[in-house]
């Protein structure tokens, strides 16, 4: 299974863990990355994630988040086709960067795109029939996968 974690997920382990929701999402992201490390799933990402991470003004956090990225073979570069798909997705109400995450995850043939951004998830839910990837919150998705009859 190919898992695309957007930058909100990659940042979650380094966010202030005072709120229960943040702790639970961070734990879910950690367990997902453990499954990736164990070879059960493949982590894919994209050039837009690299751009967003590079824009973080905190060098320590930027370095820590960068360590969570997959190897370069699993990073989708942005192409004219990806940008065109991103523009089409923007017309559905997605922010530009979010649209590019979707376009890149579709290009990578990801099974799921995970995000901690509620607005992004709600917009995706409204547009689900027009997307070629499922977009979910990492905590909800991991719980769903763990309780599936054929859980890995």
Residue ranges and their predicted role:
Residues 62-87:
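Helix-adjacent hinge/juxtasegments
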Residues 9, 49, 82, 100-101, ...:
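Alpha-helix capping/helix-boundary segments
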Residues 4-57, 70, 75, 139-144:
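PIN/NYN-family metal-dependent endoribonuclease catalytic core
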Residues 32, 64-65, 101:
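Residues within well-ordered alpha-helices
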Residues 2, 11, 16-26, 91, ...:
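Acidic, PIN/NYN-like endoribonuclease modules and their adjacent C-terminal/linker elements
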Residues 51-55, 94, 118-120:
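Acidic, metal-coordinating catalytic cores used for nucleic-acid/nucleotide bond scission
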Residues 77, 96-99, 115:
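Short beta-strand scaffold positions
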């Amino acid at each position: 299974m190919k898992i695309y974690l957007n930058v909100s997920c990659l940042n979650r382990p380094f966010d202030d863990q005072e709120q229960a929701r943040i702790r639970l999402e961070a734990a879910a992201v950690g367990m997902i990355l453990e499954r990736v490390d164990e070879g059960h799933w493949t982590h894919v990402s994209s050039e837009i994630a690299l751009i967003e991470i590079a824009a973080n003004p905190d060098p320590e956090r930027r370095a820590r988040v960068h360590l969570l990225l997959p190897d370069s073979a699993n990073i989708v570069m942005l192409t004219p086709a990806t940008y065109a798909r991103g523009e089409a997705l923007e017309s559905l109400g997605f922010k530009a960067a979010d649209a590019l995450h979707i376009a890149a995850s579709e290009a990578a043939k990801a099974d799921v795109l995970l995000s901690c951004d509620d607005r992004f998830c709600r917009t995706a839910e409204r547009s689900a029939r027009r997307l070629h990837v499922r977009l979910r919150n990492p905590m909800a998705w991991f719980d769903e996968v763990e309780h599936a009859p054929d859980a890995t």
